[in-house]
């Protein structure tokens, strides 16, 4: 294939698509560049589906190479290893909008690999990778209902900004990524600084309008490439099987889906399914058990969806806007710094907040360099929470994604480092799950942070909305169950305060989600959120005035930046001895800020006292109480402050004539001395005889402190 190149303007950036040069054995390959950020995306699809497979095996791998930023990886092996959290999140960002566009019944394995090969620090590669995945699928010939476009939307000074740069984004009140086709939005992922529903909806619409430039360019690019579509046809519907399953199961399934308790309902449905499979096979319908099971699932979907659209009660008897029963408790773990147990129906999260010092911050190694994250939120979804057994180990993609969503929901209300100098880690342990565990994590996180005494700006709650859309109409559902999520058309999660939205995530399985539907969903979500916040406020209305007795207290003092070296000492000897002897953690910034962290208040006071002594300036004419540390023929050296010695000349020991210094002083003597002079070289002249003159003020007592070991 000859190289084919397509360039177009996308907001403030120039985007170039190129194929036909690299990876020519892949089904499709596209190099996408946006102002020097280059992502190489390949697609490989198997021509035949594996026998017996009943699911669509789509894999998306996004990977960053450090050479893209002119760096060599750290670590012993000096090469990239397992995917980072950021890479995992972007893999999900690519996967979510493309997955619904593969036709039902297409079960051939497809793998999308996006590799960042060059990075401009001002241009984030995630949007570039999403555009590349869309372009590669569009020219692959694989059955795909795209292309899609992708856009990042910021909100600055009351205006929407298309694809803000990495330097602009910190000043933006919004970081929203939206993806969709020419006619519909498919995916939204966002974090906001407590914005109104109207602003959030406007951002989605703005992003969808702007991404049309991408969709049009990819269509033109695909036409230039001219790949022939695969010769694939959807499997025919077995009408006889469909009718037989409906005949045998409709009535019983209808009753089963009135059972409110999840475990009992699942057990009942499982028994119905086993009987139906057996009866269908016995009736002579030519299909295997797997196909019968698929048709049984389709019938389940039709029953649940039809009931909702007709205005009948939902699976657990609720109406569309009703929230499940709520239960909130704080301070449930005696030794944790902050804890909360949040229960909504059959979804439950035990959320724990821990306070740490600056050294506990997570060091994140990114393409453009390292950064420290002072707020971490981790989400764990063990198999027991859904009554199952399973492998336990490192977090899976879903857990990483849900944790990040919950973090986005809470981040807007977190205090700055100046307001609260602690590093904070929140862990959400999902102990029960039947829908919307990520939003339970948002609610639990807000409660646990308040219980820990973190001065968050406001309480935050989250709610998951669903949608059932049929030809005869649509219904938006509040606080969806797991089954409603699985059988519905939309997963729409909103987190926020009483004032506005802090996070919005939307995944849509069908085309045709209109602005009207999103508007209704946001309005309904606001009502649900306010209801949940009211219940949460009954448990705890404001952050606790004091942090836990088991949390470290952080005390902050300022010293002269030139004195930092004195506190650290040679090879770190002084600060190491300080931390070991006082039992504190001590951190220093280049501007002279010193943070002392200790659970024991007296230990912190002792560390502060000793640091102040180390960094104190010697004052002329002041009287100090010091210790004799060395004798010489011409006088004695007295330590008056940690690391600071002065000379008492032989003539300044007493009014009488002194022949031998040792006759008057010995090493270890504690004496009063007056500072006569500090010369330009920092040498200190002291006097014992003037310090003992009757008109002088009381002596400043010597301060015991860590001294840097003398050089041998």
Swiss-Prot record:
Which GO terms of the molecular function aspect are on file?
3'-5'-RNA exonuclease activity; magnesium ion binding; polyribonucleotide nucleotidyltransferase activity; RNA binding
GO BP term (any one): RNA processing
Q: Which PROSITE patterns match?
A: KH_TYPE_1, S1
- Catalytic reaction(s) noted: RNA(n+1) + phosphate = RNA(n) + a ribonucleoside 5'-diphosphate
Q: Which CDD domains match?
A: KH-I_PNPase, RNase_PH_PNPase_1, RNase_PH_PNPase_2, S1_PNPase
Cofactor(s) recorded in Swiss-Prot or TrEMBL: Mg(2+)
* Localization in the cell: Cytoplasm
Which parts of the sequence bind Mg(2+)? 485, 491
Q: Got a GO cellular component term for this one?
A: cytosol
Record key words, sorted: Cytoplasm, Magnesium, Metal-binding, Nucleotidyltransferase, RNA-binding, Transferase
Listed InterPro entries: ExoRNase_PH_dom1 (IPR001247), ExoRNase_PH_dom2 (IPR015847), ExoRNase_PH_dom2_sf (IPR036345), KH_dom (IPR004087), KH_dom_type_1 (IPR004088), KH_dom_type_1_sf (IPR036612), NA-bd_OB-fold (IPR012340), PNPase (IPR012162)
What Enzyme Commission number does this protein have? 2.7.7.8
The reply on keyword Transport is: no
Translocase among the record's keywords? no
Q: One Pfam annotation, family name? A: RNase_PH
Q: Which residues form the S1 motif domain?
A: 621-689
**Domain KH span(s) in chain numbering:** 552-615
Which NCBIfam families does its entry note?
A: polynuc_phos, PRK11824.1
Family (UniProt)? Belongs to the polyribonucleotide nucleotidyltransferase family.
Q: Which PANTHER family match?
A: POLYRIBONUCLEOTIDE NUCLEOTIDYLTRANSFERASE, POLYRIBONUCLEOTIDE NUCLEOTIDYLTRANSFERASE 1, MITOCHONDRIAL
Give the function comment from the record. Answer: Involved in mRNA degradation. Catalyzes the phosphorolysis of single-stranded polyribonucleotides processively in the 3'- to 5'-direction.
Subunit relationships: Component of the RNA degradosome, which is a multiprotein complex involved in RNA processing and mRNA degradation.
Q: What is this protein called?
A: Polyribonucleotide nucleotidyltransferase
GN (gene name): pnp
């Amino acid at each position: 294939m000859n190289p084919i190149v397509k360039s177009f303007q996308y907001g403030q950036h120039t985007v170039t698509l190129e194929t036909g040069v690299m990876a020519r054995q892949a089904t499709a390959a596209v190099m996408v560049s946006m102002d020097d950020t280059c992502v190489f995306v390949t697609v490989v699809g198997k021509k035949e589906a594996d026998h017996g497979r009943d699911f669509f095996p789509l894999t998306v791998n996004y990977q960053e190479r450090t050479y893209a930023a002119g760096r060599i990886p750290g670590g012993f092996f000096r090469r990239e290893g397992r995917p980072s959290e950021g890479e995992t999140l972007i893999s999900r960002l690519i996967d979510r909008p493309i997955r619904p566009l593969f036709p039902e019944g297409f079960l051939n394995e497809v793998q999308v690999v996006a590799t960042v090969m060059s990075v401009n620090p001002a241009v984030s590669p995630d949007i570039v990778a999403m555009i590349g995945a869309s372009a590669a699928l569009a020219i692959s010939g694989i059955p795909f209902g795209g292309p899609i476009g992708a856009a990042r939307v910021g909100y600055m000074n009351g205006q929407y900004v298309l694809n803000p740069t990495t330097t602009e984004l910190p000043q933006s009140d919004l970081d929203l990524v939206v993806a969709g086709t020419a006619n519909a939005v498919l995916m939204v992922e966002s974090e906001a600084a407590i914005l109104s529903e109207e602003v959030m909806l406007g951002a989605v619409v703005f992003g969808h309008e702007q991404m049309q430039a991408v969709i049009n360019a990819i269509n033109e690019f695909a036409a230039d490439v001219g790949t022939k579509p695969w010769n694939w046809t959807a499997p025919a519907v077995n009408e006889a099987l469909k009718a037989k399953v409906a005949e045998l199961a409709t009535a019983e399934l209808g009753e089963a889906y009135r059972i409110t308790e999840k475990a009992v309902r699942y057990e009942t449905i499982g028994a119905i399914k086993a009987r139906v499979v057996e009866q269908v096979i016995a009736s002579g319908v030519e299909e295997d058990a797997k196909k019968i099971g698929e048709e049984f699932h389709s019938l389940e979907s039709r029953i649940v969806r039809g009931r909702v659209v007709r205005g009948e009660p939902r699976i657990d008897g609720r109406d569309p806007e009703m929230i499940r029963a709520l239960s909130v408790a704080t301070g449930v773990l005696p030794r944790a710094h902050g804890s909360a147990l949040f229960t909504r129906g059959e979804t439950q999260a035990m959320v724990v907040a821990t306070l740490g010092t600056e050294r506990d911050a997570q060091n994140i190694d990114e393409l453009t360099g390292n950064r420290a994250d002072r707020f971490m939120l981790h989400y764990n979804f063990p198999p027991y929470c859904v009554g199952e057994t399973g492998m336990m180990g490192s977090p899976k993609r879903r857990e990483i994604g849900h944790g990040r969503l919950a973090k986005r929901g809470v981040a807007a209300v977190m205090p700055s480092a100046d307001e609260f100098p602690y590093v904070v880690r929140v862990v959400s342990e999902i102990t029960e799950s039947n829908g919307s565990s990520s939003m339970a994590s948002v609610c639990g996180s807000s409660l646990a942070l308040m219980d820990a005494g973190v001065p968050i700006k406001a309480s935050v709650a989250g709610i998951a909305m669903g949608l059932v859309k049929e030809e005869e109409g649509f219904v938006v559902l509040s606080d969806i169950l797991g089954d409603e999520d699985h059988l519905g058309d939309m997963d729409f999660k909103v987190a926020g305060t009483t004032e506005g939205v802090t996070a919005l995530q939307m995944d849509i399985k069908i085309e045709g989600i209109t602005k009207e539907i999103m508007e209704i969903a946001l309005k309904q979500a606001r009502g649900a959120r306010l209801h949940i916040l009211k219940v949460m406020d009954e448990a705890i209305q404001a952050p606790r005035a004091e942090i836990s007795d088991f949390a470290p207290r952080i005390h902050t003092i300022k010293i002269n930046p030139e004195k930092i070296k004195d506190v650290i000492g040679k090879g770190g000897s002084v600060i190491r001895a300080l931390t070991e002897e006082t039992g504190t953690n001590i951190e220093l910034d280049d501007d002279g800020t010193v943070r002392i962290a200790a659970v024991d208040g007296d230990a912190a006071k002792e560390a502060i006292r000793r640091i102040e002594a180390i960094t104190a300036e010697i004052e002329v004419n002041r009287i100090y109480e010091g210790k004799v540390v060395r004798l010489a023929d011409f006088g004695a050296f007295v330590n008056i402050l940690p690391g600071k010695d002065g000379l008492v000349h032989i003539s300044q020991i007493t009014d009488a004539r002194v022949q031998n210094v040792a006759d008057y002083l010995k090493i270890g003597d504690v004496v009063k001395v007056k500072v006569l002079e500090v010369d330009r070289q920092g040498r200190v002249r002291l006097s014992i005889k003037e310090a003992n003159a009757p008109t002088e003020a009381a002596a400043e007592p010597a301060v015991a402190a860590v001294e840097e070991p003398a050089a041998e």
